């Protein structure tokens, strides 16, 4: 069990949990681990970027100081999306990248996420190596001086390369589709107008007024209410919402209904399959994807491979078996023909491309997708990882699954960040599904409750 790194890097309340001191250590120790085996013996290069949080610059300066202290050349990208940084690390042939962002979390939080030279998140083993160095009582890492110290190069124009990359994935303009775009007052906000104007999109934007304090504040991929209203009000065919670092995309259809990652993958995957471009006719998702998604894919002859929760695990499964599309219900979508990580803006563009190529609305494209009602309850418990040892809990789950008779599913899993057990079920109706969950929750509370 890692001490500092969670499922998406190191996160916490900025200046209290994630302090400048910790950022310095992460820069120093992380930079060393990622560049110590540089084969050509030259100076290592690491790209650093951040989202729009007020704490970003504070942590950025501390992190960069740590990198410089072990002799690393830093390319400072300024405000950049997380997938944008991942792309630039590969495009520049850099040794690593570091993104300062807490993604969809509130402004009080921030995070530090490392990428290897391949633009991918680090393995658990690499993160563990960094943690061991952080916790070592005496810092024995190299301390170069004079010409051995690292330097900083301004690389804010790297955003131009990233935008050009996104545009090059679209074979034609996207004129004829009216779209409202929610930038979450985050990293994508700086690039939306340039990107969508270049592709002749008829678009308006909301939540792109940056002040360092309003990122994800009742906007973006986790708060789509305003976007839903604007799509209907403006008579748009589509709404696109990104989160703070734009690795997610959630859509809104022409009627103002939210369209999550499952639905987006269904639309893009169906189009790719119809044109022989969905590798192995398979879409990779996590265990959280709706049962209706799997059944809709089956009707189209598309397979659904599931992993544990986390886009890292989706990405690993895709790379290991040569799949080309995968993601999460939350809006992380990986289109590996173009990028090896979830990219909200790339996802939004390709959703629009399917609409233009088919001449269909989102409602029409999703006509065969019948979502199963889902109920999720988070139960406070004493030991979230011990639930399988409680026979009464196991029996309650088995009883519910037997009653479902194949027309539903149960998923019980520990929270990745809190002492909670998540009990989720999907079934034929909301009422029946709620009853299923209540039965399990009652037993969990009795057996494991605080």
UniProtKB/Swiss-Prot annotation:
Keywords: Isomerase, Magnesium, Metal-binding, Phosphoprotein. Binds 1 Mg(2+) ion per subunit. Activated by phosphorylation. It catalyses: alpha-D-glucosamine 1-phosphate = D-glucosamine 6-phosphate. One of its GO terms (biological process) is peptidoglycan biosynthetic process. InterPro entries: A-D-PHexomutase_a/b/a-I (IPR005844), A-D-PHexomutase_a/b/a-I/II/III (IPR016055), A-D-PHexomutase_a/b/a-II (IPR005845), A-D-PHexomutase_a/b/a-III (IPR005846), A-D-PHexomutase_C (IPR005843), A-D-PHexomutase_C_sf (IPR036900), A-D-PHexomutase_CS (IPR016066), Alpha-D-phosphohexomutase_SF (IPR005841). The active site is at 103 (phosphoserine intermediate). Its cofactor is Mg(2+). Its EC number is 5.4.2.10. The modification Phosphoserine is found at residue 103. CDD domains: GlmM. One of its GO terms (cellular component) is cytosol. The keyword Isomerase applies. Mg(2+) binds at residues 103, 243, 245, 247. GO terms for molecular function: magnesium ion binding; phosphoglucosamine mutase activity; phosphomannomutase activity. HAMAP family: GlmM_B (MF_01554_B). Belongs to the phosphohexose mutase family. Catalyzes the conversion of glucosamine-6-phosphate to glucosamine-1-phosphate. This is Phosphoglucosamine mutase. The lineage of its organism: Bacteria, Bacillati, Bacillota, Bacilli, Lactobacillales. The gene is glmM.
């Amino acid at each position: 069990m890692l001490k500092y790194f969670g499922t998406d890097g190191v996160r916490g309340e900025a200046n209290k949990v994630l302090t400048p001191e910790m950022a310095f250590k992460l820069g120093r120790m992380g930079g060393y681990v990622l560049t110590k085996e540089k084969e050509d013996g030259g100076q290592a290069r690491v790209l650093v970027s951040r989202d729009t949080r007020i704490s970003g610059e504070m942590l950025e300066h501390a992190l960069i100081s740590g990198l410089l202290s072990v002799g690393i050349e830093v390319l400072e990208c300024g405000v950049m999306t997380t997938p944008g940084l991942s792309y630039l690390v590969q495009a520049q042939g850099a040794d690593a990248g570091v993104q300062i962002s807490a993604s969809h979390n509130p402004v009080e939080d921030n995070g530090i996420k490392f990428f290897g030279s391949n633009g991918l998140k680090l393995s658990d083993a690499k993160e563990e190596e960094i943690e061991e160095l952080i916790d070592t009582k005496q810092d024995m890492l190299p301390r170069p001086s004079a010409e051995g110290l690292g330097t900083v190069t301004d690389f804010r124009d790297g955003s131009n390369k990233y935008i050009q990359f996104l545009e090059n994935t679209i074979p034609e303009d996207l004129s004829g589709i009216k779209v409202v775009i929610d930038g979450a007052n985050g990293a994508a906000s700086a690039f939306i107008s340039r990107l969508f104007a270049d592709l002749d999109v008829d678009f308006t934007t909301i939540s792109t007024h940056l002040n360092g304090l309003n990122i994800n504040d009742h906007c973006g991929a986790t708060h789509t209410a305003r976007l839903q209203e604007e799509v209907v009000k403006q008579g748009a065919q589509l709404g696109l919402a990104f989160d703070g670092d734009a690795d997610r995309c959630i859509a809104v259809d022409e009627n103002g209904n939210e369209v999550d990652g499952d639905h987006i993958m269904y639309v893009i995957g169906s189009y790719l399959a119809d044109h022989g471009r969905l590798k192995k006719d398979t879409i990779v998702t996590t265990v959280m994807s709706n049962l209706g998604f799997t059944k809709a894919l089956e009707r189209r002859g598309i397979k659904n491979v599931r992993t544990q929760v986390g886009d890292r695990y989706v990405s690993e499964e895709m790379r290991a078996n040569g799949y080309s599309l995968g993601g999460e219900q939350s809006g992380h979508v990986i289109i590996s023909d173009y990028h090896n990580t979830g990219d909200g803006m790339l996802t939004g563009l390709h959703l629009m491309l399917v609409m233009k190529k088919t001449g269909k609305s989102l409602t029409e494209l999703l006509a065969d997708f019948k979502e199963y009602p889902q109920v999720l309850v988070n139960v406070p418990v004493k030991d979230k990882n011990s639930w399988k040892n409680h026979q009464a809990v196991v029996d309650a789950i088995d009883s519910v699954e037997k009653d479902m008779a194949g027309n539903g599913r149960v998923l019980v899993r520990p929270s990745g960040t809190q002492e909670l057990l998540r009990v989720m079920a999907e079934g034929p109706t909301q009422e029946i599904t709620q009853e299923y969950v209540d039965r399990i929750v009652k037993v969990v509370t009795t057996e494991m409750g605080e």
